[in-house]
Every structure is written in structure tokens, then in C-alpha cells.
Amino acid sequence: MNHDPAETRDTAAAPLADTESPSPVSPELTPHPAPAAQDIDTATAELTVDEDDEARLPEIEDDSAEVADGPLAVGRAAIEQAVRLAPTSPGVYRMLNAAHDVLYVGKAKNVKKRLSSYARPTGHVMRIARMIAATVTVEIISTSTETEALLLEANLIKQLRPRFNVLLRDDKSFPYILITGDHWAPQILKHRGAQSRPGRYFGPFASVGAVNRTITALQRAFLVRSCTDSFFESRTRPCLLYQIRRCSGPCTGEVDFPGYTELVREAKDFLSGRSRAVKQELAVEMEKASNELEFETAALYRDRLAALSAIQSQQGINPRTVEEADVFAIYQEGGYSCVEVFFFRTGQNWGNRAYFPRAEKSFTPEEVLASFLAQFYDDKPPPKLILLSHDIEDCALLADALCIKADRKVEISTPKRGEKKELVAHALTNAREALGRKLADTATQTRLLQGLATTLGLPKPPQRIEVYDNSHIQGTNAVGAMIVAGPDGFIKNQYRKFNIRSEGLTPGDDYAMMREVLERRFKRLAAAKAEGEAAKPNDDETPQWPDLVIIDGGRGQLNAARGVLTELGLDAEVTLLGVAKGPDRDAGRETLFMPEREAIKLEPRDPVLYFIQRLRDEAHRFVIGSHRKLRKKDIREAGLQEIPGIGPSRKRALLHHFGTLKEIERASLGDLGKVPGISAESARRIFDFFHPGPG
């Protein structure tokens, strides 16, 4: 939300289509198109990295530098020109520089009055003065109400990411638990995106990991299936999940329709907040079975009760008087801000997440929080209650905007006493601790980058490191990968994979694969640089041009990489480093290679060597994961016969023994050898297929 800059306040907030016309345009307040829904089978889903790991501290610009009078006068003149044409009604304005980049998006109840405040010759903080000095054009969009202006502002800020606004970063849709309603035997699964599939949705959860853990525990407690409908319909006998008591087996009639319906009802009741009643029901059934000497049945109820207790122990605090709320607390230190968000639904804690919005130092906690909230709910349904650690300006206006989006009442408050105040205080403690950890991690990373620069003789610590690796099995499903690291650690939204396209490659020709990957990466980057685009940072302030490129390999791989850069005329602009594994692939005995320099050997306990190992291992993890996805696709299309020596009879034996392809992949070498008809050699072949070594 926007505040008068004369009072040294700025803002952010709202939705809708952009327009290039500076003339007043009344936007249609239509909701964002919902992202494609993603239903994920928990029996086959891979556990992902916690979303919070991707949250990085933004770069904070120095806002104390003086601004020259000349540029200020030019900027004020451009704004004065816009004031003459500006309406006195509500609307949104955008300030643009000479390159037509949007510097700032703001909203106002009276656009003419707001813009006039920028045209004053004095009284601006340095942040506002720098923005005015860079402004050459102002564009205005009129709206019917101030509420519409707030919504539009938030949407445009998220879409355009202006330099002088508070920016919500690392924003993703949150996962939900879905119990489907379009099949006689409902399925429990993880879901993101539009809630268009029939069924009951429970959430949001703060992370995919929290959803995975909850679904696993719910399967143990309520034995609800997680398999896809097609897998369900094809079963002739129960799968492994039935054998390990994580499914009741409705596919093959191990449980009848009324019995399964009761299990689903109990699961829904538990997720709806009636956990005490569900646990009492299970306890009664357990005691009844025990009294009737049905000890195996009693043990099953005991295990189900234990699974429910495990879920509740993971949830931490569960409020007594708050049924549905999001709790926001902001903490600032060292010019950085951390907003901690807790999600409470049906009286249960569905987790929390830390955000590190980009905001210049002069923004107050109230200003950052107000702008953060408008952007946060731009594409998410708000709960009935929103609790805040700080009072924000235009709180009633934001509540009205969220009421319009939700089509029901939404209350925003800053509690002063009671349990709600305790929830906010708990969130504030988490915000302070999260920012403290992030600042400490950043300081450690800075020291490591400085040490790396000293070891390699670099002129300054690298701001962007790219690490490359490739993976294949005898040349099949060959894939290359790039991971990126910088002052804040791994930058996962910058990772890239490269499916090898070259035909006629000799199986196992790692040099040729690396050449293709680097050619594709640096041809694109060189073209962007020639057009003046590569020097621009992306939305996360990460430079696009690498200071250091690390290749997983020795002198040969290094020379192949150098050859590519030489052909592109970039060899003088990119520093290359090859990392060769030690004898017997021992960690700590690596050798480092750089062009036209002697090999470098570091002490096994050198922190710089450990840092390089972490970079290489992360590239290896990512490329192996990409390779496995390609292999799984082939397996889905061709079946287990894709594995050399595995025909239809052995495929049937494996599926009969393990139940699912996922369980075959998870099986140890010893477990594979126990399958009738699978020899030790075949077991080794199957195991190696699912667990390949590096490139």
C-alpha cells in the first residue's frame, strides 16, 4: 500500500493487467488465472527441498548517497507534466526511467494530490530523491475505487518488480492435502494450484515436506489409499502399502465399502479439527478389541492412535481459541527484514515459513508489512482472520480488498492481549531467529568466498559461481546440469538441466557432453551480453554472468571447457576450475586444476576445499536427480524391460514381490536378490540401473 512520500513513506500492493498507455484506463477487476493444478501421488512423489531453503537475503542498496540537483530538477519536471493531466480520483501510477524500466508503482485515493507531493523541491528522503531523479515518464491508470487501486497496485508490483518498491520474493503457491470426491474409494494426495478437482482440501501447509510427513502419518492412522485411479483399477492383489499397514486395500476388497467410507470420514474429521473425538473413537475400539481378546485388531488401533499423536507432536502449538488465521510478524536488523508467517486451520498449526522481502533500509516495519501483505494475498485466498505484529496504515482498506477477493468477511487485527497476542509473539520470536540464522549463514558464506578468491588468485570474491556436471548410463538418457551459488548460498531457482541433443556421440564421451552443455549455455549468454542484457541482474539480484565456472573433472574436462569458451571468444572473461576426485574417489583428496597453472592440492580439512566439495556434490545431486527423471519416463513408456536382461516374466516377479515400481527402485541389493527368479547378477543390474554412479 502507498503512503505519502512527504512523510517518508512508500508502498506496494495489487492486481491486474498492465497497460502501456499513460491515459486513464479503468481495469477490470478479474482474478488471476489460476495455475494448473498439480495432483501428486505420494507413493511416487520425491521429497523436495524445503521451500525455506531457497529464501535468500536481498541486496540492500545504500540509500544515504546525495542526489545531484540537475537530475532532481529533470525528474520533478517530468512529474509536474504528469500532474497537469492526472485525475483527482483513485488510481495507480507508475514511474519509469529513460530505458522504460518501471522504477515504482504506487496507488492513491487522489492521484493528482499524490503526484504533486513528489514535485516538491525539498523534503524527500534519499530513497525518494533517487527515484525522482531517475524518473522521465509517469503513467496513470484510473480505478473506480481506492480498493481497486490497492488490488491493482499489488498485482503490478509482483508482475513488474519495480526497484523502489518493497518486493515479496520466493513466492510460491502453497501445497494442500486433497481427499478426492470423484471416486467411490477416495484418494489422499498432495495438491498445488487451482482447486478444481472434486473433494475436500485441507491447508495451506507451509512446505511440501510438512504435507509429505502429514500424509504418511494419515495413511498409517486411517489407511486411506494414495495410489492413482488407474493404478487402483489395475490391481488384482494388494500392493506393498497394504502389507506395511499404510492402506486398507479397497482395490481388491480387503476392506468393504462401508468400512472404507468410515476410514475416510475419520480422516476428514481429524483434518477438520475434530481430532479429540476421532482419538476417543479409536481408543474405544482398541479397548473393545482387547476385551474380546482380538489382540491383533487392538494392536492395529494402537498403531493408528500413535500415528495421530505423531502428527500433533509435529504441529507444535495448536491454539484453543483461533480456528482459522494467518499470523504475520516482522523483524528488522542490519537493514534486512524477515516476515514470519504461521498458518492455522481448523484449530491446527499447518506450519510456518520465513520470507525476506526486498526493501531499502529507510522502510519501517509497518511499511514493509503492509506492502508484503497486499502482494502475499494477490494470488492466495485469505483466511477469516489475519493477525499482525505491527499496526499498518490503511488496514481497513486492505481488509475491504481481501473481502472482495474472498467474497466474505476478512478481519485484520494487531492483538494486544490473550492467546492471539501469544501467537503473534511466537511468530515474532521465529522471525528474529530466522533472520539471525540467515545473517550468520551469509557471513559464513562471505568468508568462504573470500577464502576461495585467495586460494584461486581471483581479483575479488565471486558473486556467481556456476558448477557443471553430467550423468548417463552407457550414453543413454544423457543429461547435463548447472547449479548456481553466490553470497547467500545455493540459488536454486537458477539451476538448469540440459538434455543432451547431439547425435552420434560415443557412449560415455563425457568431454563431448560437457562441450554441448557449455556451448548452449554460453552462446545464449554471449548473445544476451551483446545486446546489453546479460549485465542486468534478474529478479533476485543475481548477476547473470559467472565469475567462476567449476567443472566436475580433471585436466581433460577443463581443457574441453576451455576450448568451448575460446571458440566463443570468452576465455578471457570466465575463470575456469576443474575438480578431480582423489584416489578411490576419496573426499578430501581432490586436485584442483586451472588453465596454465600447476595443480592445486589443499589440506583435507581446509574450509575452502570443503566448500568446493559442497558445490560439486550439489551439482552431482541435481544432475543425478535430472537423470533419474528421464529414466523414469523411459520406464513408464517401456516398462522394466528397459533394464538389460529383464523380460516379461522377471518384470511380473518383481512387481508381484514389491507391488509398485517405486518400491523396486527403493529396494536394496539384498532385497532384489530375494525375488524368485532374480539372480545375483540380475539384482545387481537392476540396482545399478536405479542407482547409477556419476557421468
UniProtKB/Swiss-Prot annotation:
GIY-YIG domain sequence ranges: 88-166
Bias (Basic and acidic residues): 1-10
GO biological process per UniProt: nucleotide-excision repair; SOS response
Major location category of this protein: cytoplasm
Domain UVR: 276-311
Transmembrane segments: none
Region Disordered, annotated ranges: 1-44
Keywords carried by this UniProt record: Cytoplasm, DNA damage, DNA excision, DNA repair, Excision nuclease, SOS response
Compartments reported by the entry: Cytoplasm
HAMAP family listed in its UniProt record: UvrC (MF_00203)
Function: The UvrABC repair system catalyzes the recognition and processing of DNA lesions. UvrC both incises the 5' and 3' sides of the lesion. The N-terminal half is responsible for the 3' incision and the C-terminal half is responsible for the 5' incision.
UniProt similarity note: Belongs to the UvrC family.
Protein name: UvrABC system protein C
Organism the protein comes from: Rhodopseudomonas palustris (strain HaA2)
